[in-house]
A protein has these predicted regions:
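Accessory/regulatory regions of helicases
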Residues: 237, 253-257, 262, 414-491
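Nucleic acid-machinery interaction/catalytic patches
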Residues: 1-431
Length: 491
């Protein structure tokens, strides 16, 4: 919230004090406040102090988050323009923060910069098309953006293109369909530039596995969240298993859950522990528990998984050892290089947990270790190296800015994914955001519309994929972007 407030040049004290007043008026009767309500109000009162203290600390260290850097840049723009004489080109921008608007306008007005739009005439001239929303507003509101800045708009969108809209059932099918289309396109013409724009990063592994199996070069610029690696669940399920320990016995459903995870059943059976048979026998006896004596002392892998928690050092060392065993299993059985890389990073993650435990922050309980491990896991993204000039490029929609391709494949064109749709903001509500000029879900929709339709301006072939089956929280509703294309029949 602080980041956006600064980037949009909002008066900090005004909005934070306003937020406190709004909460008091709308939500609470002071006479009926409980302990939680009182704590909430104390927090609200302290937020301006938190901002002030954070600002002073960052200033003293000459560092800052991006929004703060934007605010400082606008305040020091005069000094910058005096000391730096270079001419500036602003290329491919669309939705600007208020700070960016100030910087752009000052430099352009002084003849020290120019702006190069990446927008088709069709989107600019149609006053109702979301893709042109921001740029239309800039040209209308910035007095010096005269005709020469609008004459540069392209006219590619209306040219003839091969467009296919493909509906599939289930999320995983989208990834497989996209991968197969990309494989066929590459084999037909390897010189064409091909991109898969992935709406759900969790399916990156499926796409990479499919493309790699055909020996086709690829590059994934979006990164791969380590938490999406399927082997991670082995460790998360071990936490759940050990938390049920009562006198060396575990709840059978948790034992089932861990053995259902990839690698575990195979490794246990190969080590001489007939875990399938043991679980079946317990079920026949209508037992809800499994004593650890059935598996302990029979193999290294069995001890690593089922040994009750004793202390943090020994448990973390066990998880490091388990990571290494899984890695050897993956190498021996010729699993993908991505999976091997992921388990290596899991091992690194556990070593980081060990370092934290050996520092002043001692992790005494299993739940403490779980909290640290999952926190580190959430923030870990793998950089996947490939060839950015050959083969199939894989990225998220926002990463496609100012890039063009011969063949564009977009997945997850469903409402609630592309575009993201209406979502609650974490702290500052919609009406306060509107009052102070902060972005709402409306601006988010305009932003996604620009990136999507801009991507369709120049390719010769376009493959658009959506899930027509209700799955999880998503209804299977076709994206409004697809409906726009079908209704207006453009291009």
């Amino acid at each position: 919230e602080f980041n956006e407030i600064d980037a949009q040049l909002v008066d900090v004290n005004l909005i934070l004090n306003f937020m406190g007043a709004v909460e008091q008026i709308e939500e609470w009767d002071p006479k009926k406040l409980g302990d939680l309500g009182k704590q909430f109000f104390k927090f609200q009162e302290r937020v301006p102090k938190y901002y002030d203290q954070l600002y002073k600390k960052l200033q003293s260290q000459q560092i800052g988050y991006s929004g703060l850097k934007y605010r400082e840049a606008t305040q020091n723009l005069g000094h910058y323009m005096t000391s730096v004489q270079a001419f500036h080109f602003f290329v491919g921008f669309n939705a600007l923060t208020k700070a960016e608007e100030v910087i752009f306008q000052e430099l352009i007005a002084e003849g020290r910069a120019t702006i190069l739009w990446d927008l088709d005439k069709h989107f600019y001239k149609n006053p109702y098309h979301s893709a042109g929303h921001f740029i239309r507003n800039y040209i209308k509101e910035w007095a010096f953006l005269n005709q020469k800045f609008t004459s540069q708009f392209s006219n590619h969108f209306s040219k003839k293109k091969q467009i296919e809209i493909i509906n599939v059932s289930k999320n995983l099918s989208q990834a497989r369909t996209a991968a197969q289309i990309a494989i066929n396109a590459y084999l037909k013409n390897p010189d064409n530039s091909i991109v898969i724009v992935l709406g759900d990063e969790r399916l990156l592994h499926t796409i990479l596995t499919s493309i790699s199996s055909e020996g086709i070069p690829w590059n994934a610029s979006m990164g791969y969240p380590l938490k999406n690696f399927r082997g991670v669940n082995v460790f998360l399920k071990i936490f759940e298993l050990l938390k049920t320990n009562i006198d060396g016995s575990y709840i059978l459903s948790k034992v089932n859950a861990i053995t259902d995870e990839i690698y575990v059943m195979t490794l246990l059976e190969a080590s001489g522990i007939p875990i399938k048979k043991i679980i079946k026998q317990r079920k026949l006896k209508r037992s809800a528990n499994l004593s650890s004596k059935h598996v302990l002392g029979k193999s290294v892998i069995g001890d690593l998984i089922f040994m009750p928690f004793e202390n943090s050092d020994s448990f973390i060392e066990r998880m490091i050892a388990l990571s290494e065993i899984i890695k050897k299993h993956l190498i021996l059985n010729k699993f993908s290089s991505l999976e091997i890389y992921c388990i290596e990073q899991i091992s690194v993650l556990w070593r980081n947990v060990l370092s934290i435990n050996e520092s002043k922050l001692v992790l005494e309980k299993l739940i403490d270790i779980e909290l640290v491990f999952t926190k580190l896991l959430d923030n870990e993204t793998l950089d996947l190296k490939g060839d950015p000039f050959r083969g199939v490029q894989i990225m998220g929609l926002l990463e496609t800015r100012i890039l063009d391709f011969d063949h564009v494949i977009v997945t997850h064109l469903n409402e609630g994914i592309l575009p993201y749709g209406k979502t609650p903001f974490p702290w500052i509500p919609f009406d306060v955001r509107k009052k102070f000029g902060l972005n709402t879900f409306i601006e988010q929709d305009h932003l996604y519309a620009y990136h999507f339709f801009r991507l369709l301006q120049r390719p010769k072939r376009i493959s658009l994929i959506y899930n027509d089956a209700a799955e999880g929280l998503f209804s299977g509703e076709k994206s409004r972007f697809l409906i726009q294309l079908e209704y207006f029949k453009r291009p």
